[in-house]
Swiss-Prot record:
EC top class, as a word: oxidoreductase
Pathway in which this enzyme or protein is active: Isoprenoid biosynthesis; isopentenyl diphosphate biosynthesis via DXP pathway; isopentenyl diphosphate from 1-deoxy-D-xylulose 5-phosphate: step 1/6
Cofactors (names): Mg(2+); Mn(2+)
Protein role: Catalyzes the NADPH-dependent rearrangement and reduction of 1-deoxy-D-xylulose-5-phosphate (DXP) to 2-C-methyl-D-erythritol 4-phosphate (MEP).
InterPro entries named among the record's database cross-references: DXP_reductoisomerase (IPR003821), DXP_reductoisomerase_C (IPR013644), DXP_reductoisomerase_N (IPR013512), DXPR_C (IPR026877), DXPR_C_sf (IPR036169), NAD(P)-bd_dom_sf (IPR036291)
The protein's name in its UniProt record: 1-deoxy-D-xylulose 5-phosphate reductoisomerase
NCBIfam families recorded: Dxr (TIGR00243), PRK05447.1-1 (NF003938), PRK12464.1 (NF009114)
Highest taxon, organism lineage: Bacteria
Organism the protein comes from: Yersinia pestis
Alphabetically ordered keywords of this record: Isoprene biosynthesis, Manganese, Metal-binding, NADP, Oxidoreductase
GO biological process: isopentenyl diphosphate biosynthetic process, methylerythritol 4-phosphate pathway involved in terpenoid biosynthetic process
Binding residue positions for 1-deoxy-D-xylulose 5-phosphate: K125, S151, E152, S186, H209, S222, N227, K228, E231
Catalytic activity annotation: 2-C-methyl-D-erythritol 4-phosphate + NADP(+) = 1-deoxy-D-xylulose 5-phosphate + NADPH + H(+)
Taxonomy of the source species: Bacteria, Pseudomonadati, Pseudomonadota, Gammaproteobacteria, Enterobacterales
Entry binding sites for NADPH: T10, G11, S12, I13, G36, R37, N38, N124, E126, G215
Length: 398
C-alpha cells in the first residue's frame, strides 16, 4: 500500500486525487493533507480519510480545524505554515507526494518532496516554470521520481519510450526515436468569440470551460491560453525538448490529450474522456493501471476530431509564454508572477479580460533581470514582477 501526502488537498486536483484513493482503498493510504484556508472541507477530508497529519496555511485556520476535529473525536494532528507543509512533504514513511498547491506558493513544499527523494506527482507546473534547471538538478541529485499530472504532460509521458519515462528530463528525444512533441489545447471558451467582444468578458464567462472542470485561476488561464503557454514551458523542461521539438495544436474536443511523433512516421497519442482522475490514477499507480472512476470514451458519441493552428492575435498570452521560454528562466519567472497577479485582479473585477496580456507583457518587457542561479534568486524575481504587475494594475485603474 502506498502512503500519500497531498499538497493542496482541498483544490480541484486534491479532490480528484482523493476520489482515486476512494476508488482504490486497498492500494492507497492518506498520511498527510495540506491545504490553504478551507477549514470545513479539510475537516471533512480528515474525517473521511483519517490522515495522521494535516496542515493549514495559517495558524488561525489550523486552530479552527483543531476545534472541528476535536468535536468529532478525530486524532489527526494539525499544524500550520509553510514549514509544516515542507515537513509533511518529506515524511520518512510517505511514498508519494501529490504536489498540487497552485502557483509559486507550492514551490517550497514541492522542492522538499524532491529533496527527500519521493515519488512526486507534479501538478504544480510553476515549480518548473520558475525553477526549470534548478528544479531538474534537484531531481537528479536526490534521485526523486517525477510523474506529470497535467493531462497533456501525462499524455506525452504515456506516449514516450520507457527509457525516457525512467530518466525524465535528461534523456535525448532524438536518440530515442522521437522527432516532435505535439501539445494539444482546446482553445478555451472563447475559441469562436469575436475579438471585439473580448474586453467585455466577465470572470464567470472565462471560468466556463467547455470540456474541463477546473479551478477559477486555471480556467482563466485556459481562456487566455496562458495555461498552454505555461504547459509549453513545463514540457520543454520535463521532456528535455528544444523549441524545434515541440508544437502547440488546437483540438477543441479535448479527446486527444497530446501526441508524440516518431522518426519512423508513427504518432502515438493518449486519448480519453476529459477528466483529471485519469492522469492522476495513472501517475498514482504507475507502472500499474487501476480504476480512476472515469467513464470510458465513446467514440461514436465523440464523432469528429478536429485540429487547427493557434491564432496568436486571439491568444497573445500563448505567444508571450513561448517567447519568454526562449528568453530564459528570469523571463518565465516574471511572466508567471505577473500572470498570477493579473488573473487575480481580473477575477476580482479590477481589470478587463484583455488587460491580462497587457499587464503580463509590460512586466516581462520592463524588467531587466539576470538569470537566477538559486531558488532564492528566483523568489526575488518573483517578488519584483508581482510588485511591477500591481503598479501596472493601479495605473490602469486611475
Amino acid at each position: 500500500m502506498k502512503q500519500l501526502t497531498i499538497l493542496g488537498s482541498t483544490g480541484s486536483i486534491g479532490n480528484s486525487t482523493l476520489s482515486v484513493v476512494r476508488a482504490n482503498p486497498e492500494l492507497f493510504k492518506v498520511t498527510a493533507l495540506v491545504a490553504g484556508r478551507n477549514v470545513r472541507e479539510m475537516a471533512q477530508q480528515c474525517l473521511e480519510f483519517s490522515p495522521r497529519y494535516a496542515a493549514m496555511s495559517d495558524e488561525h485556520s489550523a486552530k479552527s480545524l483543531r476545534l472541528l476535529l476535536a468535536e468529532q473525536g478525530s486524532d489527526t494532528e494539525v499544524y500550520s505554515g509553510e514549514t509544516a507543509a515542507c515537513e509533511l512533504a518529506a515524511l520518512d514513511d510517505v511514498d508519494q507526494v501529490m504536489a498540487a498547491i497552485v502557483g509559486i506558493a507550492g514551490l517550497p513544499s514541492t522542492l522538499a518532496a524532491i529533496r527527500a527523494g519521493k515519488q512526486v506527482l507534479l501538478a504544480n507546473k510553476e515549480s518548473l516554470i520558475t525553477c526549470g534547471k534548478l528544479f531538474m538538478d534537484e531531481v537528479k541529485r536526490s534521485r526523486a521520481q517525477l510523474l506529470p499530472i497535467d493531462s497533456e504532460h501525462n499524455a506525452i509521458f504515456q506516449s514516450l519510450p520507457e527509457r525516457i519515462q525512467r530518466q525524465l528530463g535528461y534523456s535525448s528525444l532524438n536518440e530515442n526515436g522521437v522527432s516532435r512533441i505535439i501539445l494539444t489545447g482546446s482553445g478555451g471558451p472563447f475559441r469562436e468569440t469575436p475579438l471585439s467582444q473580448f474586453s467585455d468578458v466577465t470572470p464567470d464567462q472565462a471560468c466556463a470551460h467547455p470540456n474541463w472542470s477546473m479551478g477559477r485561476k486555471i480556467s482563466v488561464d485556459s481562456a487566455t491560453m496562458m495555461n498552454k503557454g505555461l504547459e509549453y514551458i513545463e514540457a520543454r523542461w520535463l521532456f528535455n525538448a528544444s523549441a524545434e521539438q515541440i508544437e502547440v495544436v488546437l483540438h477543441p474536443q479535448s479527446v486527444i490529450h497530446s501526441m508524440v511523433r516518431y522518426h519512423d512516421g508513427s504518432i502515438l497519442a493518449q486519448m480519453g474522456t476529459p477528466d483529471m482522475r485519469t492522469p492522476i490514477a495513472h501517475a498514482m499507480a504507475y507502472p500499474m493501471r487501476v480504476s480512476s472512476g472515469v467513464a470510458p470514451l465513446d467514440f461514436c458519441k465523440v464523432g469528429a476530431l478536429t485540429f487547427t493552428t493557434p491564432d496568436y492575435q486571439r491568444y497573445p498570452c500563448l505567444k508571450l509564454a513561448i517567447d519568454a521560454c526562449n528568453a530564459g528562466q528570469a523571463a518565465t519567472t516574471a511572466l508567471n508572477a505577473a500572470n498570477e497577479i493579473s488573473v487575480m485582479a481580473f477575477l476580482d473585477s479590477k481589470i478587463r479580460f484583455t488587460d491580462i496580456e497587457v499587464i503580463n507583457r509590460t512586466v516581462v518587457e520592463g524588467l531587466l533581470l539576470s538569470e537566477p542561479t538559486s531558488v532564492e534568486e528566483v523568489l526575488v524575481i518573483d517578488r519584483k514582477a508581482r510588485d511591477v504587475a500591481a503598479q501596472v494594475i493601479a495605473k490602469l485603474n486611475n
